[in-house]
Amino acid sequence: MDGKFGKYGGIFVPELLIPALEELEAAFLHYSKDRRFNEDLEHYLREYAGRPTGLYHARNLSEKLGCRVYLKREDMLHTGAHKINNTIGQALLAGYMGKRRLIAETGAGQHGIATAAAGALFGMDVDVYMGTEDVERQKLNVFRMEISGARVIPVDSGSRTLKDAINQAMRDWISSVEDTHYLIGSTMGPHPYPTMVKHFQSVIGREAREQILEIEGELPDTIIACVGGGSNAIGIFSAFLDDDVELIGAEGGGEGIESGNHGATLSAGSEGVLHGSLSYVLQDDDGQINEAHSVSAGLDYPGVGPEHAYLMETGRAMYEPITDAEALRGFKLLSRCEGIMPALESAHAIACLEKYASKPENRGKTVIVNLSGRGDKDMFLAAGLLGVDL
């Protein structure tokens, strides 16, 4: 494994971390083929996380939009989002490696909750780094992490969001590699993380492919998923990369590309190195990383997983910015049509679906939307944006 997707990916980290990454790669390559490890992983995903998740035909939404819409229900998983697929996988691997402590970064809080849950499950200490701005936005999730035994460490530097939480987590790891595993929550970071996280999230795509073939007898025309770091998207895209299936990623368009206040890294960024890998980043002319903005705490990251940069460059996938206002409309649309409240991250994918369906050439097409998480965590924020005082 060279950790490259075309020219993207690789390892750009301090020399002190190279041995830890090499140890992790060797363990991942070994245990991902180990029968007992895979039996354990399958057991915990089924009995603890709640897999397989359903592929739900959203009939009301389909009728309204003029497409055959299916929702891959990752929102039904324990802890409320797809993140648990990866945290169970990595925490199990860390245990097999003899690590006793997990550290993680989190933006929306979903990865932090899923890491805290995995730590409790496997009896490991957990420290979660979270930007103070995100701590304020996601107070409920902070409590959920703490009640599961994790220590939440607020990060007050820089933009006080996900980027800065990652920086602090990496500093911690440099000083604690002997007994600590850094459980990165998305398909970003230095090799082997993008490949490893994709591996643990690919269960989404494998299930969705099998389910749609059983229901429809053929593959879908299009897959839509939201993209921050990009793990839920790569998880579902992975099973369809070699097929004639259109792949669309919905990025956090914030207040619009022209405003500069957005998280649309692929739509408006450029090549650069961030958090250990070469990908697309939001940066100024001097290469300084810009702050990202999205109504969704999980999409305000100024980078993106390197495989997404490769998929865009090769034309295999396209990426569309979705504004905060459009995402909020998507949140209301799914809630009112189906009684399903999506996470604000997933609402970007619903809004992207709405724009997709408005094009005459897409009428009647079969679309799978990856519903990466549920909206419980966003109720107070969404209510405030909709002018409702709770």
From Swiss-Prot:
Residues passing through the membrane, by range: none
Gene Ontology CC terms: cytoplasm
Assigned EC number: 4.2.1.20
Pathway assigned in UniProt: Amino-acid biosynthesis; L-tryptophan biosynthesis; L-tryptophan from chorismate: step 5/5
Pfam family, one: PALP
GO molecular function: tryptophan synthase activity
UniProt entry tagged with the keyword Lyase: yes
The UniProt record lists the keyword Cell inner membrane: no
Substrates-to-products reaction catalysed: (1S,2R)-1-C-(indol-3-yl)glycerol 3-phosphate + L-serine = D-glyceraldehyde 3-phosphate + L-tryptophan + H2O
Keywords: Amino-acid biosynthesis, Aromatic amino acid biosynthesis, Lyase, Pyridoxal phosphate, Tryptophan biosynthesis
Family to which the UniProt record says this protein belongs: Belongs to the TrpB family.
Protein name from the UniProt record: Tryptophan synthase beta chain 2
Name of the gene: trpB2
